[in-house]
A protein has these predicted regions:
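Active-site proximal beta-strand in glycosyltransferases
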Residues: 3-4, 61-63, 76-96, 121
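Short N-terminal targeting/anchoring amphipathic segment
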Residues: 53-70, 84-86
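Acidic anion/phosphate-binding donor-loop and adjacent secondary structure
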Residues: 97-100, 143-163, 198
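Membrane-proximal helix-turn-helix segments that form the acceptor-binding/catalytic region
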Residues: 101-120
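Donor nucleotide-sugar binding/catalytic pocket of nucleotide-sugar-dependent glycosyltransferases
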Residues: 116-132, 136-154
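Conserved donor-binding/catalytic core segment of Leloir-type glycosyltransferases
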Residues: 121, 157-187
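Conserved active-site histidine-acidic residue motif and adjacent donor-binding/catalytic loop
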Residues: 171, 192, 199-222
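Conserved small/polar residues in nucleotide/adenosyl-binding loops
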Residues: 226-228
């Protein structure tokens, strides 16, 4: 199959550091290739360019990984009438409707609920149940949980820090790293955002790792928690 994966166009794919969605899209394309399919990444914020690039090839399936592009789904369908279309929302607060207006997500969510043309690949069962609760068309809802490309990670049976835990993820209120910072034996890695009481000056915060370094060293620990 010939499959197009549409990214946000905010940062490069694959990312050099933090970029959970971008890493996921890269892993999808890599895995599709290993399975004998052709996974093409289109990664630009320019809606016109997205439609143009999609129309230049004959795709069997198009998966849009940025919910902000909901407003061009009909245009994509018109440009690629033979392709199956799906969209995924990676918004972390789908199940918290009180947050939607503050993040500009209310219009996007309304469209996702009312959509009955294109598949909605939910990245978690939590999101699936939220859509279902709000009367989305269940025939268009499919659960496709996020995962990690395990083959890229260095594996060892004897980690360097067997009694230590690594918490890997962007430092932000949603992930609540600040609650665990006083626990001995836990180290934190991730892009710091100045929106949380997490203290980045403490020794347990190791900063942000480059992607390749992360692949080599995330298994240095007895337990690694990757929070995307």
């Amino acid at each position: 199959m010939k499959i197009a994966l549409v990214g946000p166009g905010i940062m490069e794919i694959p990312p050099k550091g933090w970029g959970a969605v971008e890493s996921l899209i890269w892993d999808y394309a890599t895995e599709l290739g290993e399975l004998g399919h052709e996974g093409t990444i289109i990664n630009t914020p320019d809606r016109t360019q997205i439609i143009r690039e999609l129309s230049e090839e004959k795709y069997d399936f198009i998966h849009v990984h940025y919910d902000v592009f909901y407003d061009i789904m009909d245009y994509i369908h018109k440009a690629c009438p033979d392709a199956k279309l799906a969209i995924s929302s990676h918004y972390p607060y789908i199940d918290q409707p009180d947050r939607h207006p503050y993040d500009g997500y209310d219009k996007i969510y309304k469209w996702l609920i009312e959509n009955d043309k294109y598949y909605n690949f939910c990245i978690s069962y939590k999101d699936y149940e939220t859509y279902k609760r709000d009367s989305a068309n269940v025939d268009k809802l499919l659960v496709c949980p996020n995962g990690a490309q395990h083959r890229d990670y260095h594996f060892t049976e004897k980690p360097l820090k067997p009694s230590w835990t690594l918490y890997l993820g962007r430092i932000e209120p949603r992930k609540r790293q600040y609650l665990y910072q006083d626990i001995y034996g836990v180290e934190f890695v991730g892009k710091y955002t100045d929106t949380t009481s997490f203290d980045r000056n403490r020794d347990c915060y190791l900063g942000q790792w480059e992607h390749e370094y992360k692949l080599q060293h995330v298994t240095d620990y007895g337990l690694s928690l990757i929070h995307i």
